[in-house]
């Protein structure tokens, strides 16, 4: 059996083939945290627009924990706001309000509000993953993955929902554990 985790799933339910983990309060959640999963047990961890809620000092131990839970060769699939494309959107429009959401996003989480603390471009995200021992790092297309039918921020575009001609807001990268 393939063990797939939707980490930071929020209100998105990918169905019974996935384990849903989030710190929020949603009916479909299976767990609140990944910490109690056995080491080297998970085939795929998908985290869409989660990393940006942690600052650069916090993210290394978090990614190390996630990596420790992946089987050898297991996949960490990430989606984060793409700084290069946000900059391109700003250059095209001259309107900062068009990028404030993905750049400084906020979300209610229980009795508090959490905010984006950092941003990545392709080079910085790849360098971070390589420094932690991830290999075979590549971009992924939401149209070709098993969860592509579930619309989440990995499919965000400017103009909104212009998936044919728009600029992708999300940087989608996946990496293998130690290949």
Annotate each PLM feature.
Residues 3-10:
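Conserved class I S-adenosyl-L-methionine
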Residues 11-39, 47, 141-142, 147-163:
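Adenosine-cofactor binding site in Rossmann-like domains, unifying the SAM/SAH pocket
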Residues 5, 21, 48, 81:
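Active-site flanking residues adjacent to catalytic metal/cofactor-binding acidic residues
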Residues 3, 43-44:
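Structural motif
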Residues 3, 17, 136:
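Residues at the starts of beta-strands that form the adenosine-phosphate
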Residues 56-65, 69-71, 75-178:
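S-adenosyl-L-methionine-dependent methyltransferase catalytic module, highlighting the catalytic core
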Residues 44-50, 59:
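A short beta-strand submotif of the Rossmann-like class I SAM-dependent methyltransferase core
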């Amino acid at each position: 059996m393939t063990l797939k985790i939707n980490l930071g799933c929020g209100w998105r339910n990918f169905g019974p083939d996935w384990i849903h983990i989030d710190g929020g309060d949603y009916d479909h959640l299976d767990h609140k945290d990944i910490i109690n999963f056995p080491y080297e047990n998970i085939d795929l961890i998908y985290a869409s627009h989660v990393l940006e809620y942690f600052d650069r000092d916090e993210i290394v131990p978090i990614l190390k924990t996630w990596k420790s839970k992946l089987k050898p060769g297991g996949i960490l699939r990430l989606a984060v706001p793409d700084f290069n494309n946000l900059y391109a959107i700003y250059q095209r429009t001259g309107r900062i309000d068009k990028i404030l959401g993905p750049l400084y996003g906020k979300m209610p989480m229980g009795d508090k509000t959490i905010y984006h603390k950092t941003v990545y471009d392709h080079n910085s995200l790849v360098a971070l993953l390589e420094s932690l021992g991830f290999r075979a790092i590549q971009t992924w297309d939401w149209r070709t993955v098993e969860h592509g039918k579930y619309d989440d921020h990995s499919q965000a575009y400017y103009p909104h929902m212009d998936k044919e001609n728009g600029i992708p807001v999300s940087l989608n990268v996946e990496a293998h554990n130690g290949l």
